[in-house]
Amino acid sequence: MDLNRRSLIKGSVAAGVTALFGTAAQASTKVPAKWDESHDVVVIGSGFAGLAAAIEAKKAGADTVVLEKMPTAGGNSIINGGILTATCCPQQLKHGIKDSPELLAFDMLAAGLYMNQPEKVKLVAKSALSNYEWTVKELGVEYNLEVIGQEGGHSVPRYVFTKNGSGSGIVTKELEKLKKMGVPVRPRCYVERIFRDDSGRVVSIQIREGYRFPKAGSGKVKTIGVKKGLVLCYGGFSRDVDYRMMQDPKLVAKLDSTNQPGATAELWRETSRIGCAQVQNDWIQCTPWNSPKEKGMGLGWTFSQSGAAEFGLWVNTAGKRFVDELANRKVRADAIMVEQNKGLHAVAICTEANLKSYNVARPGMLKKLLESGVVKQYKTLADIAADYKMPADVLAKTVETFNKAVKDRKDPEFNRIMNPEQVPLVDGPWYAAEMSPKVHHCMGGLVTDMQCRVMDISTSKPIPGLFAAGEATSGVHGAVRLGSVSYTHLRAH
């Protein structure tokens, strides 16, 4: 027994030493003697954060280029739901909603279990309105001025909708701006290596130009010199099953992701190799409201969140509510997983009368979801019960109790915040859709300071010439990212 234990310890130490020296050798990869091209600022990633960073770099007079490994620009941002937090915006004022940066910061810290960095949270909250205004004045983004939405974990309704109901409403404007500024956004450029010189400064990168995702080794190898700064905006790794399971073993392959196919971990590994500090990589968010009938993000979430979570209710197939429909995403996703482990399913329910805001915010969407079968229409509540094999009497009692909470503006069962525009669920037509969690967002990542400089794991000091923003970084969200805060976060930094 003792011999086996000593052998195990000896073997573990040997493996650890090998891993240590192997890592050190990799980190000291020789800097290329010459470059094929060079730029003042090189931005990796073409989502919200990368494009905003490129705009600001060019405005500051830097020779700037954006590299994107996929065949088209936009990353997850272009398939984003087109919602962003904007405290004290015109839409809030129109609906008489009182809000403040301080309240937003409180909500972010509470949802994040106070694992967020307070200074970053305050910056994001303080910048929410100015970021919204920047997209309007600088980019020309158009928003729906009639409605305001409330995502889970927020104390009040505070998110606005792009007019086209998609993140593409922002991304396309950023791309247009960069084109006018003469900043190239180069697709199919996969970054393989980041090089630091003897002083520790990031000086160049190795890419594969003409890369064909996900074909390893495709494309022509080139080196690019970085004169002033490399900006890492490569996003999360929700599509990388091996890497995400290394961080959180329950996020198995059969669990779908909302992300685009390129949300993989190559640069998470590479930045670790060169000594970048990373924290909280195992805090990976799952959405609660996606449809199991759709692949990836889909569209069904718009009904389950902007319709049923805000103005209807969620029940399990036992006919009972099981969670505050406006709790943060982790609380709701975890609650659905608990129900699924019992052999039950989660169903979002709403009535025509309570979908007025949804239909104004996303005109034509309900029709599209009905045609696809993701959402179904029913004449009566009993019809929903029959279709989902719920006990009709239990479901009826659940809705009756919920309607009393709506009238009283107080939910004793789950303490849900009641939208002032919500009315009791009484008359049909009724609508329902099944929900199932999907892997969505990485809260952890690179450790940066308030100037977005990436920190060195060995010195806890900034790595010269290396910056980062967006989902690739940590510090803003802590344990949970509140919905609709992503662009506010990306642009603020």
Question: How should each PLM-predicted stretch be described?
Answer:
Residues 1-15:
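N-terminal secretory signal peptides and thylakoid transit peptides that target proteins
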Residues 11, 69-184, 188-193, 314, ...:
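Conserved N-terminal/central alpha/beta ligand/cofactor-binding core
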Residues 35-47:
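Beta1/beta-strand and adjacent pyrophosphate-binding region of the FAD-binding site
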Residues 196-224:
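Conserved beta-strand-loop-beta-strand element in the redox core of flavoprotein oxidoreductases
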Residues 212-213, 217-219, 225-294:
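Glycine-rich loop(s) and the adjacent beta-strand/alpha-helix scaffold that form part
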Residues 268-390:
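An anion/pyrophosphate-binding glycine-rich loop and adjacent beta-alpha core
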Residues 394-476, 480:
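A glycine-rich dinucleotide-binding beta-alpha-beta segment and adjacent secondary-structure elements
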Residues 488-493:
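Conserved small/polar residues in nucleotide/adenosyl-binding loops
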